[in-house]
Amino acid sequence: MSGSHGRSVRRRTFVLGATAAAGTAALAGTARAAAFGWSDDGSNYVVDTGADLVFKVSRTNGDLTSLIYRGTDYQGYGGMNSHIESGLGTSTVSIGQSGTTILISVAHGTLRHYYAARSGENNIYLWTDKADTSVSATRYILRVKKGLFLNDEPDSYTYAPTTVEASDVFAKSDGQTRSKHYSGLRVMDYDHVGWTGGGVGLWIVRSNHEKASGGPFYRSLLRHQSADGGGLYEILYYGQNQTEAQRFGLQGPYVIAFTDGGAPSSSLFPGKLTTSWADSLGMSGYVGAGGRGRVAGVGISGRNTAYPYTVGLANPAAQYWGSARASDGWFSIGGVLPGTYTLTVFKGELAVYTGSVTVTAAGTTTLNTIAIPSSNDPGNASAIWRIGDWNGTPAGFKNAGLMTYAHPSDVRAAPWTGNVVVGNDETASFPCYLWKDVNSGILVYFKLTAAQAAAAHTLRIGVTTAYANGRPQVTVNDTWTSAIPSPPTQPSTRSLTNGSYRGNNHTFTYSVPASAWRTDAGQYNVLRIDVVSGSGTTGYLSAGTAIDAIDLLA
């Protein structure tokens, strides 16, 4: 089969039967005689969009088995197709047409999955409805044939033959590292992911992620490419460095989109895509625009205008977010399912305000100006010295700009060791990550005035995540050592080595007595920070933590 013409399969009329899977009850009609329509080749449902795209879905298991655009089949590698997880297995698959829309419905246990095509479009719209944990559904993967979009991006390991870690982090001969984890992007940073080349662009436009988990700053794999082929992902629930429980319900649409080499149309992006044409298709869990509401805030006071602010909504059923306007903090978050949500205001990625808001169908909940108490922002506290900024990220620290798209062993990384002198480019000199087996025991040198040295002070260390319960214990001038702090709740998976510092922000506080300080104002005080834990292994997989900020309060 090549392109949308000259097909060997014949068109057939679809008649709804009593055993049709969920989602087809609202569909009826006969396939059009024109190019747009569907057919059955005995093993697959074949859909011609009437544009330049023809695709096939297995009647047995719901896999996407062929994806032909302008005569080239892009789908599959290594004998594997495109599907939920690694394939659902035997499923009930049905098809129907309603006017200019064709819907394929896949039922597997409690899970429902849908493919929709619209006449004249080079797009496939997908939805996935997770009812519970009985069917594993962490992702949809679009597998792409090898050699079609060759590249050497951070998430492509085609040219990286040496395994560095866990069979998913690799090194090139020049010492640069590559991994499917190294997208370098938070969910809120991207609308689409894919490749372009040879006058063709192939993309997945993400959904609004309302049923995913982790919030706006979550980082996960988005795509990969190896010598075998490539993969584009829609994340349904990813456990890597995850901070939230799994949500259930219908997620979508996410869109497989072909272009002539450019980016996909912004009309497909989350927050802009309208799907009123899907309202009557009968998909399980579907809620149209009329059944959703909006939250609008007139402003946010108490902000530090040097930082971006994000407003998040979350409850066990759904999550949403939106950016606050830089000038006044105005925000508007639409397409929200009815319910009561925790509203969180983030300075950068640091939560500085929480409240509650209730959303109703077809309604707008308008909030008066949200006032962030000064004490909620640790950056407002008066400090003798401060390393980094209190923004919930390691930004500005040594190697921080590299670690979302490279392994710590990457040749481009500056040395992870080395001591720090306050007043001498201290933030850029301090490593963004500390590990028990790599750079534990880092020393920070600083001076105090006589008056400052005569008083006790609070030392704070903010972290953004930890691996294997790594947490900081401090010693001052080899005369005073803090207790070992209890480990805060953090994800249990790898994080620091696979492109993510995003766990649970936590601040450790240490009350340092006056007797610990040097009495000579001309001498340096020495702070030693050790990473302690009874877990972890060695090297970059020893217990570790990511730094947000360190300061000594006045």
Give the ranges of each region predicted by the language model.
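N-terminal secretory signal peptides
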Residues: 1-9, 18-27
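Extended, loop-rich substrate-binding clefts of extracytoplasmic carbohydrate-active enzymes
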Residues: 77-129, 139-141
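Beta-strand-rich recognition/accessory modules
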Residues: 192-286
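A short, amphipathic beta-strand motif
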Residues: 293-303, 329-331, 369-370
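Short amphipathic beta-strand segments in non-cytosolic proteins
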Residues: 308-327
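A short, solvent-exposed beta-strand micro-motif common in secreted/extracellular proteins
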Residues: 329, 339-349
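Structured interaction patches on ligand/partner-binding surfaces of diverse proteins
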Residues: 349-368, 372-375
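Beta-strand-rich ligand-recognition modules
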Residues: 439, 445-454, 462-554
